[in-house]
């Protein structure tokens, strides 16, 4: 697509949203609590901040403000305010460890962009299934495209199930005053995925082209039971237990992948 000559600022808002899920089986309350503590530490606020800062670098955004927080009993949040223009350090809010704004300037620019992540560890009360979910949103204005960080984020989070939504909102005008409701070609989020990611996941799309909304759901193809057991040795399982846990995990993953409750099905 030929580069548009715009009149003023590019007012299109491009938002890339992820829901990523990590599934595990833990057969005791202690094991489930240990898993939640483990996964909570794996995705703590410090590590997530590093991932999001790298995301900023990949999409060519400048960091204006960073806030991160770990929660009790579990969960973490990170929010980064970014822009596409070079940074004027005198106008940047710097938050210290006491969550106090050091600089006197308060940012209130509606044309700025943001990247945020929130985590949600949880477990089933009876079955032993544990699920970790992280929500990530990369929302940009101007020429910055969040799609440039798509492959990096998928690789960094190494998830069993991923749901992705990309949408473009608003419009921008060219030098002739004509409105443009999107400024690049796309018919699927999969257009921007690397070959190795496409080979790793089963995927399907639900797209609303007239609204510039694109949705892709992903399920990891490779299933090895030992990768889903927490504090359990697969060799210690009976044949019946082995089959039961596989069916339980497969049901959980399929329900999340399709977004609805289903009857117990066997993994083929």
From Swiss-Prot:
Q: Which reaction does it catalyse?
A: S-adenosyl-L-methionine + H(+) = S-adenosyl 3-(methylsulfanyl)propylamine + CO2
Asked whether the keyword Lyase is assigned, the reply is yes
Instruction: Mark the residues carrying the PTM Pyruvic acid (Ser).
Output: 113
- State the GO CC annotations: cytosol
Question: Which GO BP terms sit in this record?
Answer: spermidine biosynthetic process
**Enzyme class per UniProt:** lyase
Q: Which domain of life is it from?
A: Bacteria
Task: Give the signal peptide, or none.
Answer: none
> Cofactor(s) for this protein?
pyruvate
- Gene3D superfamilies reported for this sequence: S-adenosylmethionine decarboxylase
In its record, the post-translational modification comment is:
Is synthesized initially as an inactive proenzyme. Formation of the active enzyme involves a self-maturation process in which the active site pyruvoyl group is generated from an internal serine residue via an autocatalytic post-translational modification. Two non-identical subunits are generated from the proenzyme in this reaction, and the pyruvate is formed at the N-terminus of the alpha chain, which is derived from the carboxyl end of the proenzyme.
- Report a single Gene Ontology molecular function: adenosylmethionine decarboxylase activity
Catalytic site: 113, 118, 141
Q: In which pathway does it act?
A: Amine and polyamine biosynthesis; S-adenosylmethioninamine biosynthesis; S-adenosylmethioninamine from S-adenosyl-L-methionine: step 1/1
Lyase: is it a keyword of this entry?
yes
Q: Which UniProt keywords apply?
A: Autocatalytic cleavage, Decarboxylase, Lyase, Polyamine biosynthesis, Pyruvate, S-adenosyl-L-methionine, Schiff base, Spermidine biosynthesis, Zymogen
Write one Pfam family the protein is assigned to.
AdoMet_dc
Cofactor: record remark:
Binds 1 pyruvoyl group covalently per subunit.
What is this enzyme's EC? 4.1.1.50
Subunit composition and interactions? Heterooctamer of four alpha and four beta chains arranged as a tetramer of alpha/beta heterodimers.
What family is this protein classified in?
Belongs to the prokaryotic AdoMetDC family. Type 2 subfamily.
- PANTHER family linked: S-ADENOSYLMETHIONINE DECARBOXYLASE PROENZYME (PTHR33866:SF1)
Q: What does this protein do?
A: Catalyzes the decarboxylation of S-adenosylmethionine to S-adenosylmethioninamine (dcAdoMet), the propylamine donor required for the synthesis of the polyamines spermine and spermidine from the diamine putrescine.
- What name goes with this protein? S-adenosylmethionine decarboxylase proenzyme
Encoding gene (name) = speD
């Amino acid at each position: 697509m030929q580069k548009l000559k715009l009149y003023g600022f590019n007012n299109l808002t491009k938002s890339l949203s992820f829901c990523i899920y990590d599934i595990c089986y833990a057969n005791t309350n202690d094991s489930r609590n240990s898993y939640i503590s483990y996964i909570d530490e794996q995705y703590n606020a410090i590590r997530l901040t590093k991932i999001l800062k790298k995301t900023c670098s990949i999409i060519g955004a400048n960091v204006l403000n960073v806030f991160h927080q770990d929660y009790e009993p579990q969960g973490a949040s990170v929010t980064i305010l970014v822009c596409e223009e070079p940074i004027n350090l005198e106008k940047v809010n710097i938050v210290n460890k006491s969550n106090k704004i050091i600089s006197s300037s308060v940012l209130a620019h509606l044309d700025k962009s943001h990247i945020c992540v929130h985590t949600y560890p949880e477990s089933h009360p009876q079955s032993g299934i544990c699920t970790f979910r992280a929500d990530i949103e990369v929302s940009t204005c101007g020429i910055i495209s969040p799609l440039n960080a798509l492959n990096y984020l998928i690789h960094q989070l190494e998830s069993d199930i991923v749901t992705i939504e990309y949408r473009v909102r608003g419009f921008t005008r060219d030098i002739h005053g004509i409105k443009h409701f999107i400024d690049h070609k796309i018919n699927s989020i999969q257009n921007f995925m690397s070959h190795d990611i496409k080979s790793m996941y089963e995927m399907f799309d639900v797209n609303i082209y007239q609204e510039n909304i694109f949705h892709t759901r992903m399920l990891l193809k490779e299933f090895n039971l030992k990768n889903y057991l927490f504090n359990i040795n697969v060799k210690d399982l009976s044949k019946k237990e082995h089959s039961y846990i596989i069916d339980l995990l497969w049901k959980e993953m399929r329900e999340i992948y399709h977004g609805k409750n289903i009857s117990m099905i066997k993994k083929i």
